[in-house]
From Swiss-Prot:
One of its GO terms (biological process) is prolyl-tRNA aminoacylation. It catalyses: tRNA(Pro) + L-proline + ATP = L-prolyl-tRNA(Pro) + AMP + diphosphate. The lineage of its organism: Archaea, Methanobacteriati, Methanobacteriota, Methanomada group, Methanococci. Homodimer. This is Proline--tRNA ligase. It comes from Methanococcus maripaludis (strain C6 / ATCC BAA-1332).
Amino acid sequence: MEFSEWYSDILEKAGIYDLRYPIKGCGVYLPYGFKIRRYSFEILRKLLDETNHDETLFPMLIPENLLAKEGEHIKGFEDEVFWVTHGGKTPLEVKLALRPTSETTMYYMMKQWIKVHTDLPMKLYQVVNTFRYETKHTRPLIRLREIMSFKEAHTAHATKEDCDAQITEALNLYGEFFDEICVPYIISKRPEWDKFPGADYTMAFDTIYPDGKTMQIGTVHNLGQNFAKTFELEFETPDGEKDFVYQTCYGISDRAIASLISVHGDEKGLVIPVDVAPIQIVLIPLLFKGKEEIVMDKIKELNRTLKSEFRVLLDDRDIRPGRKYNDWEIKGVPLRIELGPRDIENGQALIVRRDTGEKITVEYSNILEEVEKIVSMYKENLKIKADEKIKNFLTVVDFESDVNALSEKVKAALLENKGIILIPFDESVYNEEFEELIDASVLGQTTYEGKDYISVARTY
């Protein structure tokens, strides 16, 4: 099965997302998918809170005249803005945009709050819905008209040095987040022609999907003083002088959820990282005539024991065990524990790992400790697999001074190996003309094993 078919199929079968809503590019998070989203963004919120970011919530509606202040930035998506033009039947004097992003709303308010250097740094974030009138082919959780999970952080600083340090913190924070949800990535400095409009520069996280295409899953932008000058974000320095603040912004969206689903899935279904799994352990009673009560009493006891540390479900549906195995493999539940009369007689239980399919017999008397060990191994294995997956999709090609020869070499590597092609960095081919020659996207300048490369790939 092709990846795109698998992806659409698994969103439905695993109860992740329903795209049958009657607006293109808008869908519904189903309960199981929403829990994956919730646990994932809890990790992200924790990382932000621990680094002194404050969560807030700004309005969704933006007056047209305020949005227009973004100038160069708004040109990047002015054709994608949704507009509210009426209040009931009454035309509005000023059109209102549905939030495509929040620079204008946040920076308008920051101007009210930032007066002196002691008000800095200011580090705010929110998790909100944003709207883009995507005209390209929409894809669930990947390319949406209503992005339902947009985490955007915006910071303001007194000095360029503090601003640069914030970029480093944001990159480390995002790296830790993607490591936690077992999504592999490379980090690139986007080329000038592909940076965030209005930014000094953009750093981006890209992951690789099973079909060899890359997906941008996070961005970090150094805005310098560009937006501050537009929005008159001035403050009084310790010397009593006036200066503009230095700013950063960085975002992660539903693509993080799409990626943790896509990267580790297999022909059986999802393989979910433990920390974001809605159900971490499923218990399956193996019932035999005359032994039902013994088995159910024991497995209910096990349920109570494990629930002290894990999210556990006891599947007591009146269907065959094989059907239950299939259902929970599709949903990617990390561990399955089976318990039948013979297991009880022997003082044992059978644990099955979703990531490897390995079946492990453990002593029932020590089951909590055994489960903790296996969960730890599961987590480590998924992280190792994540690293392997992206390394297997990286290909380094030798540099050629002849641009046409180099482009043919890159195209051949993309055709043969797919994934990300790394070219030793050289300014002579770091341009849009070369991007057109190779019929792929230049991700940017990437450091790999201590060397600088131009990274190129076919992208979503």
